[in-house]
Every structure is written in structure tokens, then in C-alpha cells.
Amino acid sequence: MDYGKAASEKLGARIRGGAIITKYGHSGGPIRGIEIYEAGHPLPDSETLRATERILGITGSLEAGRMVLFLVSGGGSSLFEKPLPGLSLQSLTEITSALLLGGADISELNTVRKHLSSVKGGRFALHCMPTEIFQIT
């Protein structure tokens, strides 16, 4: 949320729209021009999918010359998620839960996630083409 507030304050009217996904109970109030969604963390849930679909909708119709500012802070890898076709949310959640219970660290978890996700491993950047995308983590 702090990233989003800072970006909104610094960029002002240059921001034409956007969305933030945060953990339940962490929205911290409205940000001008930005939609705020709360979703499951560390396990993705139906709100995770809804929020991710909204971001894909916003970014999927941008023309060349536009820019996507993609800000990711702690927890972002579970909050921005859409399973690959053929993989259910339930299966993804079960896999994630098993990894967490098995003691996987965040690097190991994210390595597996990128192979199961429609938005990780460069897939979100491809989705955003032909726009420029700037990611800050």
C-alpha cells in the first residue's frame, strides 16, 4: 500500500488508473485513481483470482507508448496469481500449502509458483506488450 500511495503522490495526474492487491485488513484507505483489492495470503483464494483478472483486464488493452508501473512488495507473489490453464485454484493452493508446511523458503516457493502461474516467469510482461513495463520490488 505504501508503494501505491507514494506512486500516486509522485506521479499525480500521470496515473490514468491502476489496482493494488493487498492482504485482508491492510488496505489502509482509498488512493486517488487506484482500485484496491484484498486477497488471501500466503495462500491464494478466489479474491486473488478476481483481483488478478482485474489487473489483466486493465493492462490487456493498453496501446504502445503507454507504461505499466508494476510495484511488488512482500507477499506479492501470493497476492498476484492466476493458475495456468488446466490447474485449479484448489490444486495451486494445496501445492503452496504443502510447500509451506514442508519448510520451503520463499525462493523455492517462487521457483515452483512461476511454473504453475499464468502471470509469473515473464508471462505478465508478455501480456502487457506492446507497453513498457517497469517493475520495482
Report the location of each language-model feature.
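N-terminal loops that bind phosphate or other acidic moieties
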Residues: M1-T137
